[in-house]
Amino acid sequence: MATTPDAAFEALMNGVTSWNLPKEPTPSELLLTGEAAFPVMVNDKDQVLIAASFYGHGRLVVLSHESYLLHAGLAPFLLNAVSWLCPSPEAPIAVHSSLASLVKILGDSGVNAVVQPEPREALGVYCIDAYSETLTETLIRFMKNGGGLLIGGQALTWAVHHGHEKVLSSFPGNQVTSVAGVYFTDISGNRDWFKVSKEIPNLTLYVQCEDELKYDQQQLLKGMSEMDIETGPVPSQLLVHGQRAFPLGVDNSFNCFLAAARFGRGRVVLAGHESLILNQTMLPFVLNALRWLMGNQTGRIGLASEMKALKSVLPNSSFEWSETELLTNDLSVFCSCSLGKTDPKKVEEFVAEGGGLLIGAEAWMWGRRNPDSNCMTQYPNNIILKRFGVGIISQVVQRGRFPVPNPEVINYHIRRALSQYESVIHSQGSSLQEGWLNKLSQDCFYMFQMTHQRISIYDSVKEHALKMIQSQGFPSVTEQHPITKGSSQAFLLSLAYELFKSGVDRSQLLPPPTLLSPTESPMTIKISTGNDNSWVSTGLYLPEGQVAQVTLPTEATHAKLKVLIGCHIDNISQAKTYIRPPVMTYVYHLTSSQTSISWLYGGLLYIMVPDKYNQDNVSVTISGAVSAPYFRLGKTTQEEWKNLIEHSKAPWGELATDNIILTIPTVNLKVLQDPYPLLQLWDKIVKAVAKLAARPFPFQRPERIVLDKQISFGFLHSGYPIMGLIIIVEGIINEFKIRSHGVWGVTHELGHNHQKPGWTFRPHTTEALCNLWSIYVHETVLNIPRDQAHPSLNPELRKQRIKDHLNKGAPLSNWIVWTALETYLQLQEGFGWEPFIQLFANYQTLTGLPQNNEDKMNLWVKKFSEVVQKNLAPFFKAWGWPVQHAVAKSLASLPEWQENPMKMYTAESTEHTE
């Protein structure tokens, strides 16, 4: 039997070559919301007119008008439907009296059927129209127990008499089919042309049908004007993605933290943290929520252990409580923080058949602990919640007090927003509300996480997104064609990235690439334990759109090795304007012996080796990539380098020593005929950096400097790698310029990389102490005095800075950057560099270091005084440091620092006051 949607579709469409439908009846468009539901027939407007689904042990086929079940022209499909619905070939088939003529249509094709008023136990398939109000429970039970239900009808006439907004919740047919995620709507289906698909057709993004959700929102928010999340635990964001799901609490960036949904005949309320449910200030909402979740039911409310406090929070309510960890059929509502140990199918059926679910939980902590995991499908609560059209994601919302959503206003919803954007790019709709596109980019990331299981309601979203990219073309972003944040082009860039991450092949996103010739033979890189916690350069470049193969021994597939494509790791999404794509790198986990790799933008290839890596001499082989200019000090000959820069088509290359690696545009490398002297100088620079930091040399992991068109902030910033703008390239690869003008910016960032929390006093010395490395390198390696190394170190400016600080009363708030650096410069000029080196070494052996600035500063006063054997308490006090009495007393026995340079300034200050 066909048990997957694809196999089921194939069985239902076997031999069907056309849709011979009667022209007179007006069908209802069908809405699909369940994970098991899939479209079978759509028209030229992408409206679903026939759908199928699974429920319990049974199956369902829904036609959008009952006359289709009585039309002989549809006999081939009807026979397939009955065959697929029937659990066994021998099981009898019955038809409700309203469809009596269907018996003849089936009989003429050799299928026996009888008329019965309702389905019985031994029955295989039951056929009925969508208007019975007395058989709801019987039909659901029949399906759940393994029967097949063939049902047809339209809700248009019913809507006229009972109200369009009530169709999804109250139309008789929907009372049955909704449990399997299929609804009859009040929208007329177009009858002009019908597609015959060879595979499951695509769904529309959003069906614009009337619903009761506006009234649900009003009922849930009755008596509330705002949500206060200024204090208390910060909630996780929620993804509201189901058509019948809606927001209840939203911050200023459209991030939802409280939501609700209808699913089948039941209801769900979800909070991004349990505190939103258990908080006294939320009592009005909780009462509204419980009443709404109860609906017309009269059973008990089940409280899991973490929700027991609800009972005491609502002592005067009329609810009947039951403390239980188990979801049982006698409950009307179940309240919990965790559904991870509950059978997802059981929870789904509980809600589908009328139960209420109240859940409060956060996922941001789970996200921190599982950074490489898929939040929407692996976070335990989401395995269940996503079925109801909601999910908890690993991002947090803003703190604040936020007005409740206005039911009369169109609220942000991913499907509505994406559908509206689709209309905009096809010039069929007005522009999106400001800020929606930025929110949509994030939500697509989480939405696409659910598109790996062939589920129509999720896959269709990805298909629509892909068509948007294909219709508009892959966005190009350069200095000549910049893209503005929040623009349509920026959104398309983000959408393409999320689609690629979700598994869409690059060929569906990119125009055909201009292929570059790969290396003649595969290249093998040896990975050893000495490479742990680093990137290993391969000397290879993967052009955009091309595919390379990475192979490694089977025994290394559990070593957590990765391939990094590209080294420009700064995510510049928050920039106002982009001159290059916001995300330029992509990582593949090497969990199998052979991995195909590609990337939208290409890039240099690296093997990422994890911390505490313990497999030695592992061979990683790469084929299909191209050679990049790569010079390694002591290994690459000048002739090899000349050949590389002459013939390489790769746009980036690298200059490497054992201690530092420079990633430079190839066009700049072509003028560098002999990198040897330059790299020797860089090795001396980083050796000096290591010496001052009291770190072993050569480095276990070489420092990296990567130049880029655009970085996240500044023109240089620290990290691994140090990122810098291309405009500084001459100052990095021109040996003469380095020796004559220095290299302050890079050495400043190298200093940052060696700053340690134990002796860094944020925010005072964050941008001060790192300059010690700049000064040390300039004076000991480049022979450039400090007053020439940086204009801010002009002697007169230094003196004035000290005077200004003291004239203000030496407030600690003023002791930052150059003023703070001056304190350390006076110590260095008084005692030399050795005490710093010794102290930095000593700190590496200390444990239990203080965490607050005052204690950290006093420890530094004490340790520096001990190293130089001078009482430095008066010196630091003069600078405004909060020297504690106990520390000053402990240092009193040490000799006074007679040459204390602050004496001169404090004496001057005293004279002026006199």
Swiss-Prot record:
SMART domains, alphabetized: M60-like
Gene Ontology molecular function, alphabetical: transmembrane transporter binding
Gene Ontology cellular-component terms listed: plasma membrane
Start and end residues of each Peptidase M60 domain: 533-832
Pfam families, alphabetized: M60-like_N (PF17291), Peptidase_M60 (PF13402)
InterPro entries noted in UniProt: Class_I_gatase-like (IPR029062), M60-like_N (IPR035423), Pep_M60_3 (IPR042279), Peptidase_M60_dom (IPR031161), TCAF (IPR051244)
PROSITE patterns named among the record's database cross-references: PEPTIDASE_M60 (PS51723)
Role description: May play a role in the regulation of the cation channel TRPM8 activity.
Protein family: Belongs to the TCAF family.
Family matches, as PANTHER family: EXPERIMENTAL AUTOIMMUNE PROSTATITIS ANTIGEN 2-RELATED, TRPM8 CHANNEL-ASSOCIATED FACTOR 3
Protein name according to UniProt: TRPM8 channel-associated factor 3
Biological source species: Rattus norvegicus
Encoding gene (name): Tcaf3
